[in-house]
């Protein structure tokens, strides 16, 4: 039976335990996700308390991380999403995303509306990918793909 969480702290505590186990076992998120049939980003989001895993994926991930049955069950529960405190992020990486939306948020909104009309980009019917690519000018670049279904506003 599908279960839902109403307290975000239990999943945040589990995320801390998962990250500790991940570090002790020297595993990458890609290695943990391998064999689940799910995207690395989706499994990572679940491990960090933002998504629910199907039972078979939760068991596989749990085995890789030596999680107990309660933790495996928690990974299958629908979480209380959006666990970032209601303030401007202070973590430098998260802040840069906040900054990108401060600078380009209105541009993204205008371009989405111009190309699609009045509506939103779904974060439910959504895919996320992060790639590391060489920068022709030296160093490396992050290519982040946000792939969400467009949902039009419907008059009623």
UniProtKB/Swiss-Prot annotation:
EC class name: lyase
EC number: 4.2.1.104
Coiled-coil parts of chain: none
Catalytic site: 96, 99, 122
Catalytic activity, as annotated: cyanate + hydrogencarbonate + 3 H(+) = NH4(+) + 2 CO2
Pfam families hit by this protein: Cyanate_lyase (PF02560), CYNS_N (PF21291)
Family of this protein: Belongs to the cyanase family.
Protein name (Swiss-Prot/TrEMBL): Cyanate hydratase
Designated gene of the protein: cynS
